[in-house]
Amino acid sequence: MDTKDYLNGKANDAYGYFGPVKKTKGYMFRICIPHARKVEIIGDFNDWQPKKMRGYASGVFTITIKEAKIGDRYQFLITDANDEVIKIVDPFAQEIIVEEKCSVVSDNSYKFKNKKLKTDKLNIYEVYMGSFLDSDFDGLIKYAKDQNFTHIKFMPVSEYINYKSMGFTSSGLFAYCKRYGSALDFKKFIDKCHKEKLGVLIDLDLAHFDCDPYYIKSLEEYFAYDYDDVKYSYYGDMNFDPTKNFTKSYLKSAVNFWLKEYNLDGIMLTNVENMIYWQGDEARGENDKWIDLLGDLIEEIHQNKSLALASFNGIYKYDFDFDYCLDYSLRPIIRSMQDLPYKRDSYKKEINSLIGSDNSKKILGFNYIDSFLDEASLFMKINGSNDKYKQYKPMLTLLYSLKSEKLLFTGDEIGSEQIFSVYDRIGLDKLSEDQVYLNDFYKDLSKLYLKKEELNHVDSTTKLLDVEGYSLYAFIRSYKEKKLLVIINFTDIDYEIKSSYDLVELINSSDLKYGGKGNINGKINQNETIFIEDFGSCVFEIKK
């Protein structure tokens, strides 16, 4: 990397230049702080006695320490014009010990054996790494495969200070969180996933950073990555300033780092409304500079032949070059299921619009927010007491029959009653009989989604049918000459519908094997009656 490129906002590989860089003997350390009078380094390799670094006109300070080795802790000491000295953590450190506020020389020697996943179908399993701290991660791979997920997406895995939070506010964008284990173990896990044809994605929040004075904030008097005026976001964190060239290089390098050094299949940029709008507030207008930088970050991801994904806290209507975006499109479904069954017909216009929309550029599903909002898991949000499992199945049927990519949060596939919390593990091993039935239904439904081009092909189409009934929906999913009929009943009334087609039933939530009453249809001839049980759902293959 050329230092000029970093200062001009053109660098995407700064992580290989700054921080500790392996040499024949020892390591070279670099940091860029143009307005510092003096920079020193202390660490295990020099008994924590300050050693002066050489400064250059560019603002880069450098030193080679032959005694430095993997695992050594270190800090930088910065002296300003008033002879004030502060200790800081290396902003490019790839390993940080939060409790000691120090950087660590890390081992970057791992070589991946398996290539990234190539697939045009996404069924994403969203995971909070903290929920699996004491688990066998090889078991997670097997579990995700058994559940027909194509990718595991981890909520933020970069280092953060407040372990009571979910990790979206990073204190070290280049450091894997030590709470979750070692970077080496995570790389090996990713390699095993690829061997099993399972993709790995991570969340990355690049709009703001932690305001702890030992981290990036400590540079604000010298080389500030934040705005000079509007420093804090509405979360209370510090905003990255996209107008500053070194901020551009820093963020582009962070994206490139995770994709190259961890061989990830993609990155989901989270809370992108915080980039698109000033302070995340649509009423304050668009942030043109962030929008420009967002385009650069997306291009960076695509140059790594990876998926550029986004999550948006609202209904996403922009035309950026993201491959797919996760938004709040399914919130009407959740609201309707929270209501009494006889009131759900009032949501028909919204749900019909959702069914008829082309969501081929969206990831639809239920994420972690849906499992703690209103202090209830997704499953527990459903109105009622004795028939929640029965009602949950048509929700899943609707999701997996819409034209979109899919995402579920940990536990959604079993109807978990557990509210998501950073303090608790989500139990996936000891299932009730109802959860086993529900999970069997989910596995067959997701398998159908992955198998049928009528459901997963980008050129498939949807035709909404006009059927009589409260909260009753019917539509046809087609690809070329192949067609499927989907019928979903969100209310507690049985329905009989005269069939316009010859049909073969592929899945029915009322099947005995899913804990239902066994009111299935099997083969249906034209003009015969289709029976849809209360809170039932089914998918048919149309023969003619």
Task: State each model region's role.
Residues 426, 431-439, 445-447, 498-522:
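C-terminal accessory region downstream of the catalytic core in glycan-modifying enzymes
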Residues 70-74, 519-544:
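C-terminal beta-strand-rich structural cap/linker in extracellular carbohydrate-active enzymes
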Residues 31, 76, 127, 154, ...:
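Conserved, mostly hydrophobic/aromatic
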Residues 1-28, 33, 48-126, 131, ...:
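The feature marks proteins involved in alpha-glucan
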Residues 429-464, 536:
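Aromatic- and carboxylate-lined catalytic core of secreted/periplasmic carbohydrate-active enzymes
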Residues 115-118, 128-289, 293, 297-303:
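Substrate-binding/active-site clefts of carbohydrate-active enzymes
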Residues 86, 93, 97-99, 263-265, ...:
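Conserved alpha/beta catalytic core and glycan-binding cleft of carbohydrate-active enzymes
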